[in-house]
From Swiss-Prot:
Lineage: Bacteria, Bacillati, Bacillota, Bacilli, Bacillales
Compositionally biased spans, kind Basic residues: 69-81
Name of the featured protein: Translation initiation factor IF-2
Region (Disordered) residue spans: 54-105
Region (G1): 197-204
């Protein structure tokens, strides 16, 4: 005989779980609740107990007789009580029925539950739950909300498992785009590769060389068109290349929360070595957390020195495999097509190690690579499908816009009906132009896609009106206190390399309350737009030492709400960062002149002093403003207003072309012709 639970035994023998638990207690058998398992020995003992308690035939006859008599009596009472007894019996029967309802093994809830709702889910009376809460020291009514911990406490007391449902709004589909699929549904997908490097080191030549050698060779008659991405086939395996301007794939897309790249090819010219933009590219790739393969280009040139390139890159933690590191270095000549096959094989090798997989059997999700408005076709968007399969006719939501996929064109200009994971396609059918880096998701229902698209557009509009929560020194302390910041990302730019190194070394030593400083990029020269975009994507603060931001950088910083700090003394930078981390950053104020008044007449009043009868010539004079007295162009006194009146009434301000009476705090030497200049101190937005 297998084990049986207390409530199952009770149900089998038509007795309540409570009575059975009482019986077990009398038999000195310990049970914690109705879910306790009873072994064969206990079951046999119970069977014997209840067998012994069964009434004899004579007893049964007596009981039956009593029941018959009671029925007769009840019939008499029915006539007297006008059906009241019937109702009582019905209620009693109803109560008995609720007692026999089986308790569930598991309940689910979302957010919170009222006492009444919890009782219903547990198949219990609300009064019983209230009693249990009272025993736990919680005074509750039937409509009172219970939190997660209390729900779990009560349910566990009954031996019932609790599961909280987290409801995610469909408008925020980014939150479940990256949800892990079951391993059995995952299939191998092509790697997505971005090529980065310094200007004139051969990025475009390398892309052209790969495209010409692989795409056109395999697609005779196919017209290769520029859609921002393309695929090549190597050893029966595909690789997707993003043909986007330099660092855009990492910056604007990462700033918008999109991770599109799997592998970065860092192109370094063998005759030039590591240059400023090379370092920038390394920092972008590291911030995105993707593997780097170094392509040492221009090996055909006489001045080519690959060993120098390797040596320089070790300073940035890119150590070649030949030197005991884990970075793959491939010597190539993009212009002559040498080493290209080896580079592609290395990409396949990294793909194999990293095991890039996706689930093709679901609705497509992915990222916008490029988008534009065409006079003939309308909105055209290049999408990179990252998971699932996109089909012609699918309703789709892209960023804050929506539509239906009317047509899909591959990277070789052919119309296609389906696009699987890691496939770039150009689509038409969207109602507005999305932005590069926007996420997309296909839906089953066009009506739902429209609703979600419109909701997202509305939410984006509201969010735009609100403040962006980028990291700044003003709110740094608060964010540290709230536990939002564990590491402060900084970008350091200075006039000379020595200053950069000195400042970076000093900043790295700062450690306040376990929050450390991380330098994500350093450079010599003016603060550029690229620095601001990296800061925005990495939520960093930009520090400038003896350098200024250029016009584009200033504009982008304002748009992206990136905090720029400019200094001329190193220890001031350190002091400011430490003060901000400790919550002691003093606000900066600047003076703003708000108005001027001319003294037309003066009056001496006992116990009051000199009252100046004035005429406001410019702006306004306010009661709480600071003032300075100017006589013949020279400031002779600076202080505060004591009173500001119009006729006999105290006023808060007097506007231009109106007369007023003014007294100055602790100053009476006012003369006709004096100018009273009013100013306020405004906090400078850093």
């Amino acid at each position: 005989m297998s084990k049986i639970r207390v409530h199952e035994y009770a149900k089998k023998h038509n007795i309540s779980s409570k009575d059975l638990m009482t019986k077990l207690k009398e038999m000195n058998i310990e049970v914690s609740n109705h879910m306790t398992m009873l072994d064969d020995e206990v079951v046999n003992k119970l069977d014997n107990e209840y067998q012994a308690e069964k009434p004899s035939v004579a007893d049964e006859f007596e009981v039956e007789e009593k029941v018959v008599r009671s029925k007769k009596n009840s019939n008499k009472k029915k006539k007297k009580g006008k059906g009241n007894e019937d109702k009582r019996q019905e209620n009693f029967a109803g109560r008995q029925q609720t007692q026999t309802v089986e308790t569930p093994d598991k309940i689910t809830f979302s957010g919170s539950l009222t006492v009444g709702d919890l009782a219903k889910k547990l198949s219990k009376e609300p009064s019983e739950i209230i009693k249990k809460l009272f025993m736990l020291g919680i005074m509750a009514t039937i409509n009172q909300d219970l939190d997660k911990d209390t729900i779990e406490l009560i349910a566990n007391d009954y031996g019932i498992e609790v599961e909280e449902e987290v409801i995610v709004s469909e408008t925020e589909f980014e939150t479940f785009i990256d949800e892990q699929d079951d391993e059995e549904n995952l299939k191998e997908r092509p790697a997505v590769v971005t090529i980065m490097g310094h200007v004139d080191h051969g990025k475009t030549t390398l892309l052209d060389s790969i495209r010409n050698s692989k795409v056109t060779a395999g697609e005779a008659g196919g017209i290769t068109q520029h859609i921002g991405a393309y695929q090549v086939e190597v050893n029966d395996k595909k690789i997707t290349f993003l043909d986007t301007p330099g660092h855009a794939a990492f910056t604007t897309m990462r700033a918008r929360g999109a991770q599109v790249t799997d592998i970065t090819i860092l192109v370094v010219a063998a005759d030039d070595g590591v240059m400023p933009q090379t370092v920038e590219a390394i920092n972008h790739a590291k911030a995105a957390g993707v593997p780097i393969i170094v392509a040492v280009n221009k090996m055909d040139k006489p001045a080519a020195n690959p060993d120098r390139v390797m040596q320089e890159l070790t300073e940035y933690e890119l150590v070649p495999e030949a030197w005991g590191g884990d970075t793959i270095f491939v010597p190539i000549s993009a212009i002559q097509g040498e080493g290209i096959d080896n580079l592609l094989e290395m990409i396949l090798l990294v793909s194999e190690v990293e095991e890039y997989k996706a689930n093709p059997n679901r609705y497509a999700t992915g990222t916008v690579i490029e988008a534009q408005l065409d006079k003939g076709k309308g909105t055209i968007a290049t999408l990179l499908v990252q998971n699932g399969t996109l089909r012609v006719g699918d309703p789709i939501v892209v960023g804050t816009t929506f539509g239906r996929v009317r047509a899909m064109v591959s990277d070789i200009g052919r119309r296609v009906k389906v696009a699987g994971p890691s496939t770039p396609v150009e689509i038409t059918g969207l109602n507005e132009v999305p932005q590069a880096g926007d996420r997309f998701m296909a839906f089953a229902d066009e009506k739902k896609a429209r609703q979600i698209g419109e909701s997202r557009a509305q939410e984006a509009l509201l969010a735009q009106r609100g403040e962006k929560s980028k990291l700044s020194l003003e709110d740094l302390f608060q964010q540290i206190q709230e536990g939002d910041v564990k590491e402060i990302n900084l970008i350091v730019k200075a006039d000379v390399q020595g200053s950069v190194e000195a400042m970076a070394a000093s900043l790295r030593k700062i450690d306040v309350e376990g929050v450390k400083v991380k330098i994500i990029h350093t450079g010599v020269g003016a603060i550029t737009e690229s620095d601001i975009i990296l800061a925005s994507a990495s939520n960093a603060i930009v520090i400038g030492f003896n350098v200024r931001p250029d016009v584009n950088a200033k504009r982008t910083a304002e748009l992206e709400n990136v905090d720029i700090r400019l200094h001329r003394i190193i220890y001031k930078v350190i002091e400011e960062i430490e003060a901000a981390m400790q919550g002691m950053l003093d606000p900066e104020f600047e003076e703003k002149v708000i108005g001027q008044a001319e003294v037309r007449q003066t009056f001496k009043v006992t116990k009051v002093g000199t009252i100046a009868g004035c005429y406001v010539t410019d702006g306004k004079i306010t009661r709480d403003s600071g003032v300075r007295i100017i006589r013949d162009g020279v400031v002779i006194y600076e202080g505060q207003l004591d009173t500001l009146k119009r006729f006999k009434d105290d006023v808060k301000e007097v506007a231009q072309n109106y007369e007023c009476g003014i007294t100055i705090e602790k100053y009476n030497d006012l003369k006709e012709g004096d100018i009273i200049e009013a100013y306020i101190m405004e906090e400078v937005k850093r």
